[in-house]
Amino acid sequence: MPGFVVGLLSDTHIPRRLRRMPPAVLEALDGVDLILHAGDVDDPAALEPLRALAPVYAVRGNIHIQDFSDGGAALPAVVTLQIAGHRVLLTHGHHPGVLGFFLKGLDVFAQCVRLTDKGQTNWRIARRLAPLYPEADVIVFGHSHWPHVERIGRQLLVNPGAVCATSSEQPTVARLCLSEGVSEVDIIPLTQPQVSNQTPTFCNSTQR
């Protein structure tokens, strides 16, 4: 895809769940012009390998309310950029504060008892963010650990999925191509083993 290429990723949870950035992430994002991380880093130092590829912008996620972030709480909640004629907004997608932490717990419980799924979570987040940021042409979010691409009116909403996936999830990143009047997304599965603190292949925590 021609144009300005943005690498997208979210929910890496390094070093609490993954020890370091998986090589598959660096391979998938090699050659991009810019990288956006949509929250739950957890330690901003984990972004350094990405900076060797391209400039990086990152936002904080819901995990930072628990003081597990090793400085991640200092990251901004929202970043807005003008890229190739598109206004791109980056945020984690969670409700802020203690309410967001409580709602996330309810959502995880509902998924465990099969009252809802991550696709529905993305659907709800997209419909909350689109009217909240009407000036944005592209909204990039994370939080659900599940990829999502949807257009609501003129807006493109993208969740690249999670790098730190649970045993039931496929880890993914994304590449967003922007040119004048055009925005396209490729979701990229990560097939190589992750370097996890808990299992040989995937993170094994149900908490997001």
Question: What are these model-predicted stretches?
Answer:
Residues 32, 61, 110-113, 164, ...:
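Juxtamembrane helix-loop transition sites at the ends of transmembrane segments
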Residues 2-3, 9, 80-84, 151, ...:
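Binuclear metal-dependent phosphoesterase catalytic core
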